[in-house]
Amino acid sequence: MSRLTIITKDKAQVTMESLYQDLERRIVASPPGLCTIDLTRSFIKMCLAQSCGKCVPCRVGLRQLARLFDDVLDGNATEETLDVIRLTAEGIYYSADCAIGYEAAKLVLKCIDGCEDDFRSHMERGFCSCNSNQPVACVKSCPAGVDIPGYIALVHEGRYADAVRLIRRDNPMPTTCAYICEHPCENRCKRTLIDAPVNIRGLKKMAVDNAGDVPVPACNEPTGKKVAIIGGGPGGLSAAYYLALMGHKVTIFEQRKQLGGMLRYGIPNYRLPRKKLDAEINAILSTGIEVKKNISVGTDITLEDINKEYNAVYISIGAHADKKIGIDGEDATTGVTSAVEMLRAIGDDEMPDYTGKRVVVIGGGNVAMDVARSSVRLGAEKVSIVYRRRKADMTALPEEVEGAEAEGCDVLELMSPVRIEKDENDAAVGLWVQPQMISRIKGGRPSPKTAAKDEVLIPCDLIVVAIGQGIETRYFEEHGFTVKRGTIEALDTSEIKERKGIFAGGDCVTGPATVIRAIAAGKVAAANIDEYLGYHHEITSDVEIPYAGYEDKVPCGRVEVALRDAADRKKDFEPIEYGFSCEEACQESGRCLRCDHFGFGSFRGGREKQW
């Protein structure tokens, strides 16, 4: 008789693992607008199925919670029911033996604290209001609310110009977003239920690269109203575009010599080609927008002067101030610079020469990756990225980190900068770092703490600090604007309290964010400025979206955007991505499930909010 046997998976185990994978995909693809109470009940029942049954709080308590949630969803609950749910969850949380019990209870407590209105809706009206407002997941996830299923259907038919026209209804910078958008729309794509999310950004790139010159829509009749935009970045350009289409006279005041903001002075050409950016900006300006460059508000002109001449003002200054890391030696005469300073020089075509230099980049965001990859292209002999957390904790997009590593950059994770080593000429010659270890999770991210290891010296010729950007708000604060944590305080309508006719949005309100969020802020501001001026213009599109017919959506692999070989692309600043072929675009666009016609989204045409 054998003492041991090799464990092999039986049919039931294989089936269970397949079910787990299906469940994981379904959770990832959960659309916005779901009933939180119903979702929590489902989670409780799943936890109950996982329970071993040995401890009473888990075995009995979870079953009791499931029954109480059934009462809420059936409209049979009262205030007393809510109290019992809380007490039961607290009892499980503090007495369950393992995470199956107390993590389930923790979720219930979180649901009660954050969704009290949903509970009351079920108790008082017998239904959840969110069930009647469940939009298309990708449209809801896009900050600008672009009709994504619509333009994917147009790409599928090869109607690229129409796709661009449809995108412009909600986003005046389709080319920019086709190249560098963080594509949050893909995160909740319902196609994940079958295999993988649709490559939405890749399809948008297919449209803009093949559409040719697409004229902007005709502007409405002039209203006689004048609007000033302070800042010519993506947010300011977005607001200016829509306001001009509405018939208002728009003037942009730009501090630098060229428009584009961080698109020009923060995004290298290999990610966003300058020719593409210039063409997109020129298309926006073709609506009749006036531009005044090299004008700094507060120095060359005052806000009071602008306010007197214009009927409304939109402040959309970006995050162009660098942040100091605050360590000894950062004041070195040479060898230390900021990401903002470096990328700004590149944006002005003033390319620094890093030939043969050892460069250390401090930071873990997209800007840090841009700096590192640009340093390689500028001739650096060695590029090291220093980050105090793990690589998995970096805020940079995974593809950016992978791209940096493929181009030869070293990622030194769990290394916290301590001080900068200087020579007798006050030049930086190295960075001292302290090894870290991951500790408790705070605010959703693990916190690093000092490891019991010696400090390490990283020899280098240049240190680039890329730990974030700040907003230059001093002038506005001195003129009575409320500034909290370095940002201007504004309402969600972009209005400034007690400052009639002045609006603000984008990075100067939210802090440094993504391009699509700045564009969305400009769109919101334009609509509310238009209303403030006494109008209610709507931006429409006469593009006819193809009919969504029934078809069998079988599993099909996702088509990825191909990249130039790392060994070649790191030698220049030329674009690194190839576009889809017609065959690839047709296959990938055919994977779209058309949630604007099938599912809850069909009740609202796929759009949560109209202009």
Residue ranges and their predicted role:
Residues 45-67, 90-107, 131-150, 172-193, ...:
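Local cysteine-cluster metal-coordination motifs and their immediate loop/turn environment
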Residues 252, 256-287, 291, 346, ...:
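Rossmann-like dinucleotide-binding cores of NAD(P)H-dependent redox enzymes
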Residues 206-220, 282-299, 322-378, 483-499:
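Glycine-rich dinucleotide-binding loop and its adjacent helix/turn
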Residues 1-130:
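Redox cofactor-anchoring modules in respiratory/redox and cofactor-processing assemblies
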Residues 221, 226-228, 278-327, 419-432, ...:
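Feature captures the FAD/FMN-dependent oxidoreductase FAD-binding
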Residues 226-249, 368-376:
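N-terminal Rossmann-like FAD-binding beta1-loop-alpha1 element of flavoenzymes
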Residues 334-356, 424, 441-512, 553:
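FAD-site-proximal beta/loop scaffold in flavoenzymes
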Residues 508-539:
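A conserved FAD-binding loop/helix module that cradles the flavin
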